[in-house]
């Protein structure tokens, strides 16, 4: 009898051969990756040998977790100018916290390596580079002209008053309040009304919490993705539980911003509203985008429009919410400065709640306290660049092309070489006659790519502080001292809890 080609023996031999081939291929890939890992690590060690570092794990790098700020401040004191941080065995970045180093990097046009943010905020001002970034920046700058910002002050005051009214109803001096949640809704309310022509108050809308919760989740998820040795691979990340959570949070965020765009487009279908918008000397943020024509005569694409809306929706509310919350905490823990600010505000506003544009320049001491709080608690702990060409610093040390450098704003603001007793709250650092390096204080970053909305944010900070101090004395909760932790914006590991004492 002849031997069949479909016999069990032949089939088993085929299966065995397949698995042997698969095993050898897998072994080759593992060895290839190991060699690639080794060569990359050796190249980094050689290229960055001038930048010191503490010992790190060969695979996990400096796994600092929630000890990051403590370790970083140690590095700032121990390693002048800059140091090396290993994020994994083959991924490193150079941390910069000296003004002279920072000035060099911010004077260049290197791209921001924030691709992990793209699924959420798209390619708006934060992620764009080159000619397109310049076009969008020039297009949006008029949205922050002082003629636009002036009437925003009343809108800001109204939003703050809604928050304070809610606090009065909840007021119980014996039960501290976690304030970031309320401040975040207030700043979202403000940016929605000012930049996106929103009617009503998101602070009174129970559905708004889903957006702020999504932003909170994305803050954590993106931060951990950037620090992970494995999540840099999109396939692995998308298959992970974090990847699934990220997609869901992005969906919620996009539904919110899509709704904002859709609502404004519908309003502009009304001829009266359309003519009203066109007669404005300076358009609001969203209207600029909707009316925009690029240099080639084409309208802004829907993708570009949503990216800019997503970007400003995030940066315009979450960063400012962080800043306001930490300013409140700083004043609560320094009652003598809080009282002096209150006296200054009362001398300008009396016991009323009317704040105008002109009032904002009449609060010099309050402004000094705000600036000092933003130094101690930098709302944006760091910003990064990926070098498009080699860079050499004033002391002769160099970094090659392709390396990520991180301007550690938190470290810069705590550098004892430029800020004596950096942990001490001292508003006099910002008195008019106190000189400092041009790049020693950067709460809104610096250079050509600084925060486009920095004046908007400072105005909101002043309004929030002034109106809050008229109605409440801020007291710390000694049982829950905030623990700052780095995320996309500065957060507290255990929240920011304050006791509120009603003044009137």
Swiss-Prot record:
Pathway listed: Lipid metabolism; fatty acid metabolism
Swiss-Prot/TrEMBL induction comment: By clofibrate.
Residues with PTM Phosphoserine: 434
Primary location group: endoplasmic reticulum
Gene3D superfamilies in alphabetical order: Cytochrome P450
Enzyme category, top tier: oxidoreductase
Keyword list, A-Z: Endoplasmic reticulum, Heme, Iron, Membrane, Metal-binding, Microsome, Monooxygenase, NADP, Oxidoreductase, Phosphoprotein
GO molecular function, one term: arachidonate 11,12-epoxygenase activity
Propeptide: 1-4
Effect caused by changing residue 116 to F: 2-fold decrease of omega/omega-1 hydroxylation ratio for lauric acid
Residue sites binding heme per the record: 315, 451
Reactions catalysed, as given in the entry: an omega-methyl-long-chain fatty acid + reduced [NADPH--hemoprotein reductase] + O2 = an omega-hydroxy-long-chain fatty acid + oxidized [NADPH--hemoprotein reductase] + H2O + H(+); dodecanoate + reduced [NADPH--hemoprotein reductase] + O2 = (11R)-hydroxydodecanoate + oxidized [NADPH--hemoprotein reductase] + H2O + H(+); dodecanoate + reduced [NADPH--hemoprotein reductase] + O2 = 12-hydroxydodecanoate + oxidized [NADPH--hemoprotein reductase] + H2O + H(+); tetradecanoate + reduced [NADPH--hemoprotein reductase] + O2 = 14-hydroxytetradecanoate + oxidized [NADPH--hemoprotein reductase] + H2O + H(+)
SUPFAM superfamilies on file: Cytochrome P450
Cofactor: heme
EC identifiers of the protein: 1.14.14.80
GO (cellular component) term, any one: intracellular membrane-bounded organelle
Keyword Membrane set for record: yes
Subcellular location: Endoplasmic reticulum membrane; Microsome membrane
DNA-binding among keywords: no
GO biological process entries: arachidonate metabolic process; icosanoid biosynthetic process; kidney development; lauric acid metabolic process; linoleic acid metabolic process; response to hormone; response to xenobiotic stimulus
Its job: A cytochrome P450 monooxygenase that catalyzes omega and omega-1 hydroxylation of saturated fatty acids. Exhibits preferential omega versus omega-1 regioselectivity and (R) versus (S) stereoselectivity for hydroxylation of lauric and myristic acids. Has low activity toward palmitic acid. Mechanistically, uses molecular oxygen inserting one oxygen atom into a substrate, and reducing the second into a water molecule, with two electrons provided by NADPH via cytochrome P450 reductase (CPR; NADPH-ferrihemoprotein reductase).
Protein name (record): Cytochrome P450 4A2
Designated gene of the protein: Cyp4a2
